[in-house]
A protein has these predicted regions:
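Active-site cores enriched in adjacent His and Asp/Glu residues with nearby glycine-rich loops
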Residues: 1-27, 31, 49
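Charged, cofactor-coupling segments
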Residues: 27-90
C-alpha cells in the first residue's frame, strides 16, 4: 500500500521526528470485538471471515483521512458489505 500511495505522491516517512503518510495496519478481523485477528498482513484469509480494510494517510499540519470498508471473504474472492458513498468533500 505504501508503494501505491507513494506512486501517487503520498509518501510515508519521518518529518520533524513524526511519522507521516501510511504508517499503520491496513485492516483487521471483526467479530465479538472491534479489533480481532487476523491483522491484514501476509496471512491466508478464510471463507466467511469478516474484515475491515481501512487504509489511512496522516500529515501533521495538513490533516488525515481513513476510509473503511467491511468485507466478507468468499470462496471466489470478497464482497463489500459497506454501503457508504465515498465522495471527497473539503
Amino acid at each position: 500500500i505504501q508503494e501505491l500511495f507513494a506512486s501517487r505522491g503520498f509518501t510515508t516517512g519521518v518529518r520533524n521526528g513524526r511519522r507521516v503518510g501510511f504508517f499503520h495496519g491496513t485492516g483487521h478481523g471483526l467479530g465479538l470485538e472491534i479489533h480481532e485477528h487476523p491483522r491484514l498482513q501476509k496471512v491466508v484469509l478464510k471463507d466467511r471471515q469478516v474484515l475491515t480494510v481501512e487504509p489511512g494517510l496522516y500529515y501533521p499540519g495538513v490533516g488525515g483521512t481513513r476510509l473503511e470498508d467491511v468485507v466478507v471473504v468468499t470462496k471466489t474472492g470478497y464482497r463489500i458489505l459497506s454501503r457508504f458513498p465515498k465522495q471527497l468533500e473539503i
